[in-house]
């Protein structure tokens, strides 16, 4: 006679809560930390109440971002009480402890082993003979259909307004074969859009001397942005390049966009156009050459969307400098623009520059640049009315509507496409949409199947 099956009661694992702040690069770090903790046997909690420990992954790029991080730490302590701090503000442990003495541990940016060790110390996982049998599987904090793909860490540039190199160090590139393996797994799991990120995507592979690495299925790939983009484009997902520095070799990825191999989208933070301001920022200052290159890119790939960010009110920026920037934007006709008012950041060389711009002048210039770029955007989007565009669906509602993005729009930072008569669509679907209307930032349309 067979014995009845034995009931095995596994111990309940501790649960981890995560607050991830800042840029997509921080989000990828959070995913990596949680992936490791889950493979170690930890559970995840979507709220403070259910968490045994809360991780706060901080951002320290601007003083306003630091204040947001400190507020998040305070909220986590008030709501839960057991908090571990990691990320860019980890270098300011003394200041954090002075304000929040109850913090359990503080680790720095990309100190993955240290933060995982701190979690183990704070909330040990009960012994289980089954945990080691579970393979480590990637955990995502984004919707299933798009994923951020970090290809390197750190930066070799020393822009005067930036402290990222002091936090994250010089450029360290991942092996291209490892990046491609990760991308293949993401696509196999349902990712339809890969957003390539780093501190400086165009410098990828410089520290590896752009050498070639063997691929699992045969052949090889160089550690170089163009070669990596070409291989990623073969996976069948949209491939979107972010944080690109305007090196000459960026020209070589434009034909890949024209061929349809990667998404015709380029995120290049130009930061300014006035040569004196760019010089003070320690950025490239050949703005006329940049305009020539933009024209060349559009000649090769007419549908390319160019996104950029700019800083207004930088120390020493005169009204003449700012007007130069506005005139440059009129010529450049960029598709998507974000702007920031200059903020001093502790440790940044720009803090010591003369010619501080009054706050009221910063606000006035910020309003002017946003009005300028909104008008440019409105005209460019109006020209798309009547066209049919591929749109990736991000969300659907109960009334037959949906929201998605064209190839010209990255998630969260760019515009959206609002659809009517979109019943039956699901997030992640890529559909042809007839554009019916536009405003300053968004498009409005109907799926071609519904329009016919």
From Swiss-Prot:
GO cellular component: cytosol
MTTase N-terminal domain residues: 14-124
Cofactor: [4Fe-4S] cluster
Domain TRAM span(s) in chain numbering: 382-449
This protein's UniProt keywords: 4Fe-4S, Cytoplasm, Iron, Iron-sulfur, Metal-binding, S-adenosyl-L-methionine, Transferase
InterPro entries the UniProt entry points to: Elp3/MiaA/NifB-like_rSAM, Methylthiotransferase, Methylthiotransferase_CS, Methylthiotransferase_N, Methylthiotransferase_N_sf, NA-bd_OB-fold, Ribosomal_uS12_MeSTrfase_RimO, rSAM
Protein name: Ribosomal protein uS12 methylthiotransferase RimO
Originating species: Rhizorhabdus wittichii (strain DSM 6014 / CCUG 31198 / JCM 15750 / NBRC 105917 / EY 4224 / RW1)
């Amino acid at each position: 006679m067979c014995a009845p099956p034995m009931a095995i009661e596994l111990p309940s694992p501790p649960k981890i809560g995560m607050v991830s702040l800042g840029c997509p690069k921080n989000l990828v770090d959070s995913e990596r930390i949680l992936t490791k903790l889950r493979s170690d046997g930890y559970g995840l909690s979507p709220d403070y109440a259910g968490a045994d420990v809360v991780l706060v992954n901080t951002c320290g790029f601007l003083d306003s971002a630091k204040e947001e991080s400190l507020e998040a730490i305070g909220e986590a302590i008030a709501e839960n009480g057991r908090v571990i701090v990691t990320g860019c503000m980890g270098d300011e442990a003394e200041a954090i402890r002075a304000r929040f003495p109850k913090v359990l541990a503080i680790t720095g940016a990309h100190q993955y082993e240290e933060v995982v060790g701190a979690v183990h110390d704070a909330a040990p996982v009960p012994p289980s003979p089954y945990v080691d049998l579970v393979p480590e599987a990637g955990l995502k904090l984004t919707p299933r259909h798009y994923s951020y793909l970090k290809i390197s860490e750190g930066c070799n540039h020393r822009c005067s307004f930036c402290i990222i190199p002091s936090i994250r160090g010089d450029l360290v590139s991942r092996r291209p074969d490892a990046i491609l393996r990760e991308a293949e797994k993401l696509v196999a799991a349902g990712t339809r859009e890969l957003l390539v990120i780093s501190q400086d995507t165009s410098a990828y592979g410089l520290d590896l001397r752009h050498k070639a690495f063997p691929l699992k299925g045969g052949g090889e790939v160089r550690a170089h942005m163009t070669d990596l983009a070409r291989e990623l484009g073969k996976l069948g997902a949209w491939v979107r390049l972010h944080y690109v520095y305007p090196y000459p070799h960026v020209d070589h990825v434009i034909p890949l966009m024209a061929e349809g191999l990667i998404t015709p989208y380029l995120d290049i933070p130009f930061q300014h156009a006035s040569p004196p301001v760019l010089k003070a920022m320690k950025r490239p200052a050949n703005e006329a050459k940049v305009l020539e290159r933009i024209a060349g890119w559009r000649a090769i790939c007419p549908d390319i969307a160019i996104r950029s960010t700019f800083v207004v009110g930088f120390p020493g920026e005169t009204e003449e400098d700012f007007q130069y920037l506005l005139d440059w934007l009129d010529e450049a006709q960029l598709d998507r623009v974000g702007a920031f008012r200059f903020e001093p950041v502790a440790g940044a060389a720009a803090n010591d520059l003369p010619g501080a711009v009054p706050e009221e002048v910063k606000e006035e210039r910020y309003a002017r640049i946003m009005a300028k770029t909104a008008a440019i955007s409105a005209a460019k989007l109006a020209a798309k009315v009547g066209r049919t565009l591929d749109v990736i669906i991000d969300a659907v509602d109960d009334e037959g509507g949906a929201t998605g993005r064209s190839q010209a729009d990255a998630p969260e930072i760019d515009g959206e496409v609002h659809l009517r008569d979109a019943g039956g669509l699901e997030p992640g679907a890529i559909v042809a949409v007839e554009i019916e209307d536009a405003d300053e930032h968004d498009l409005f349309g109907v799926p071609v199947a519904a329009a016919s």
